[in-house]
Amino acid sequence: MAEPIPVWPGEFVRLDDGEIFVRTAAPPGATAGPGGDAAPAVFVHGFGGSSTNWTDLMHLLSSAGSGAGPALWCDALDLPGFGQSLPTEASCSVSGQAATVAALIEARGRGPVHLFGNSLGGAVCTRVAATRPELVRTLTLIAPAMPDLLVRPATARFPALCVPKFGGWLLSRVQKMSPQARVEASIATIYYDGSCVHPDRIAGDIAEIERRDQLGYGPAVLVRCARSIVAEYLRRGATSLWRDAARVNSPALIIYGSHDRIVDPRMAGRAARTFRRARVVVLPRTGHVAQMERPAAVAAEFRGLLAGNEPLPVPVV
């Protein structure tokens, strides 16, 4: 097993409602935005994740990855309350998180970006692309958490997090598990084959859980975000996420994992029918976090989107 790529360095970026932490992978001496030599990209993690979820894909898409096609200036943020970013009052709703992403793009001042989102981040990016189209050059969604009322076994406890008091009690029971047990349970859920995770990455995840356990606000953020996601799943009418998807006019790449235990890969069909300019792919032998489990395949599909190539055949799942 090859040595893992170190996490990218980062800095706090001040926005109107507070600071967020942003990690950057860019070629030395490159500039982004109008007149720059590296197209800007922004990456948004999922529920319980952080900017480090994009480490390998950022490596491949920046010049450091030496991949084919133009190099990207890659910025991955920690949503408020996750990673290194502190929570804010309105930060846990999908619309609030979308506003944070839009504010970051504007603060960077680099023009429309290639926008990437995984899981909850995929829902957030869909809303950004629908409501702020001038900020989005292309949209790449990996297992986006779009409304699907068929509850999967891995997410059966999710609605329970929304029940007053019970949600907090449920999370307190999870927190009684050792950090190592929590990391192992997460890997078993989000990967098709967890053996691909390097021991150093596991050690880093354990250390991060230990750090966040000392912060105090983690469980409350998770409960508030869970309630926001469930509310979006139940929303109907012009402001629903699927209506947002139908309004997206930028070229879109939507990637599902054939063995995703959280987002049903059969949602690929609805995504293909709903997004106007969609390249929809189901990656075989892949779980919920394709950018972590199969970053080279994700990078290749993104390059195909830029080149206008046809996607690979979608396998039957």
Regions found by a protein language model. Give the residues of each.
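Active-site loop/oxyanion-hole signature of alpha/beta-hydrolase fold enzymes
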Residues: 8-11, 15-30, 35, 55-62, ...
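Acidic catalytic loop of the alpha/beta-hydrolase fold
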Residues: 233-235, 259-263
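Catalytic active-site module of serine/aspartate enzymes centered on a nucleophile-bearing elbow/loop
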Residues: 269, 274-317
